[in-house]
Amino acid sequence: MIWLKNLRVPILLAIILVVYNEYFIFFIAFSSCQWPCKYGRCSESSVKAFMISDTHLLGKINGHWLDKLKREWQMYQSFWISTWIHSPDVTFFLGDLMDEGKWAGRPVFEAYAERFKKLFGDNEKVITLAGNHDLGFHYAIMPETLEMFKKEFRRGLIDEMKIKKHRFVLINSMAMHGDGCRLCHEAELILEKIKSRNPKNRPIVLQHFPLYRKSDAECDQVDEQHEIDLKEMYREQWDTLSKESSLQIIDSLNPKAVFGGHTHKMCKKKWNKTGNSEYFYEYTVNSFSWRNGDVPAMLLVVIDGDNVLVSSCRLPSEILQIMVYIFGGIGIVILAFILISRRVRIFKRRPSYSLLMYRSQEKCD
């Protein structure tokens, strides 16, 4: 108990360090993000949406339990704290929800889906898309995996929905290979049906793969922290959709904005429509997980009439968190050592002082 009293301050500081690093850094990060509303205030008819991609919940093959615990805690904190601060109308998860869904049998897939729902919720405000890690790339997709995803996440090849009268079209990127297979043929028929209706209001297109581009050299900066990778070249149908499929989506849907993920890098690209003055922006969202980069991100999107307003929101840096733990931990250990050393010196002095007092009293007698 004596030693514990001396360590009260270091123990209190250790608790504060953990609380700060596991809670307050998320509040600080998300408090600095803002909805990009016109004139600083969003109208009641506007839709406020989070765009999140590539959560990659780890599985048994590639995921160590400690890595899994750390990443899922980071994403859980990020999602719920940002939701509490900003209150979005809807959150879109743009694919690769799971890391090993493509290899999972039914029991494992169901357990995967249950973990995702526990982390991010299971209600009408959480809308998911499939990615290649959920189903596999085009030639690796099994009908059973496709059905399991449809059952667990209520998502077809192409879905159309309305939120506050704003249209959204959700596309399974792996069904846009364009090779005439049953999957692609079914997706193309749905696109043609949407095109034939020719609705007046242009939709927001959501998918996992970005539209075709050779590299991120074609991108504009999304924010000040965005460093554009000029070296990596993208492969059609692996890193992006093919050029033909991209043009088919643009021609069929005439989108007012496109959002995707997959590359684990941010991108903002302007697309000009041939034959008229219309254009739209495509946004690629960074991964939401620390496992795929030091500073994950999401997008805060406001759809207000024909305007699609976008701002990026960076999550806390994992390296910064680690450095705070290291230097804070070293400081606490040094403080504890000083307090213990001081206690030991005081404890050693007491016997000699008592003995001296005792002998002095004997001489006086």
Curated annotation (Swiss-Prot):
Give the GO molecular function terms.
Answer: hydrolase activity; metal ion binding
Protein name in the entry: Metallophosphoesterase 1 homolog
Q: What is the organism field in this record?
A: Caenorhabditis elegans
Its biological purpose is as follows: Metallophosphoesterase required for transport of GPI-anchor proteins from the endoplasmic reticulum to the Golgi. Acts in lipid remodeling steps of GPI-anchor maturation by mediating the removal of a side-chain ethanolamine-phosphate (EtNP) from the second Man (Man2) of the GPI intermediate, an essential step for efficient transport of GPI-anchor proteins.
Q: How is the cofactor bound?
A: Binds 2 manganese ions per subunit.
**Cellular component GO terms, alphabetical:** endoplasmic reticulum-Golgi intermediate compartment membrane; Golgi apparatus
Family statement:
Belongs to the metallophosphoesterase superfamily. MPPE1 family.
Which InterPro entries does this chain map to? Calcineurin-like_PHP_ApaH (IPR004843), Metallo-depent_PP-like (IPR029052), PGAP5/Cdc1/Ted1 (IPR033308)
Which cell locations does it reside in?
A: Endoplasmic reticulum-Golgi intermediate compartment membrane; Golgi apparatus, cis-Golgi network membrane
| Matches recorded under PANTHER family | METALLO PHOSPHOESTERASE RELATED (PTHR13315), METALLOPHOSPHOESTERASE 1 (PTHR13315:SF0)
